[in-house]
Design a protein with these regions (language model features):
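Conserved catalytic-core motifs of GNAT/GCN5-like acyltransferases
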Residues: 85-97, 226-243
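Short amphipathic alpha-helix that is part of the acyltransferase structural core
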Residues: 3-14, 94, 98-131
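A short, internal acetyl-CoA/4′-phosphopantetheine-binding micro-motif in the GNAT/acyltransferase core
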Residues: 47-51, 175-182
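Conserved beta-strand-loop-alpha-helix junction that forms the acyl-donor binding cleft
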Residues: 72-77, 179, 197, 206-217, ...
Length: 243
């Protein structure tokens, strides 16, 4: 796995995937300028500076209100801007698909998820904690899921979808299974279904997992994903104003 230095002038877009997304295909979901951007706070909590220059880091800090938190995810070491504090630092892995995944995709009972499913999606994400997931995160890309029956209001048992998009790549994310749906291979099948959709568009699927989540990494490796790089993750906060 590569670990580019912080001054690598020819950095791959996947090394700063949040920036590549917010300054590219997902610009419409962003706030900021050419130095730093963040997702709309109702969509996601990720943000990124263009680089580690003082100007870009200052612009990133300016996007964060007192008492607010953002997530930064990138391959290079994370520089904490003046005015912000790191309340969490962790490592993950970035994985890319290396083979077609259509044969692994689950199809029975799979349905498209949208605004009408948003409350159930948020509830499932809060229960299983697949990563940052907010009320409008599902608008970042297509999501699919399986419910526990055909009746109206049947429990959402599993879901997966698309998060960051950059030229040539789309991230598989939001993969989670309700405890009542475990043992059915939903995480595997839904991940493959989303990845297959991405591949059919001519793009390469990628994803992120916590470095300590060995079970998830093994699942994705069994689907043909390989580790491209380790990623650094930081939760940054601007302390609330005194008084």
């Amino acid at each position: 796995m590569r670990r580019p230095g912080p001054h690598n002038a020819r950095m791959h877009p996947l090394d700063r995937p949040v920036w590549a997304s917010l300054s590219g295909p997902q610009l419409r979901l962003s706030h900021g300028d050419d130095l730093a951007r963040r997702f709309d706070p109702q969509v996601n909590v990720f943000a990124s500076a263009r680089d580690d220059s003082p100007q870009a880091l200052a612009a990133l800090a300016a996007l964060v209100a007192p008492g607010e938190r953002i997530f930064v995810l990138q391959v290079p070491p994370i520089a904490v801007p003046d005015g912000l504090v790191a309340v969490k630092l962790a490592q993950g892995v970035q994985m890319v698909a290396t083979r077609p995944l259509g044969g692994e995709a689950v199809s029975e009972g799979v349905r498209e998820l949208g605004d009408d499913d948003a409350a159930d999606m948020l509830q499932l994400a809060q229960l299983t904690e697949p990563g940052p997931f907010l009320a409008r995160t599902h608008r970042m890309g297509g999501f699919v899921g399986v419910r526990g029956g055909d009746a109206a209001g049947a429990r959402l048992l599993g879901m997966a979808g698309e998060r960051m998009r950059l030229p040539g790549y789309t991230e598989v994310s939001g993969v989670c299974t309700h405890p009542d749906g475990r043992g059915r291979g939903l995480a595997r099948g839904l991940s493959a279904a989303v990845a297959d959709r991405i591949q059919r568009r001519g793009e390469q699927p990628f994803l992120h997992a916590w470095k300590t989540n060995v079970a998830a990494i093994r699942l994705y490796e069994s689907l043909g994903f390989v580790c491209r790089a380790e990623v650094q993750v930081a939760v940054l906060e601007r302390p609330a104003a005194a008084g």
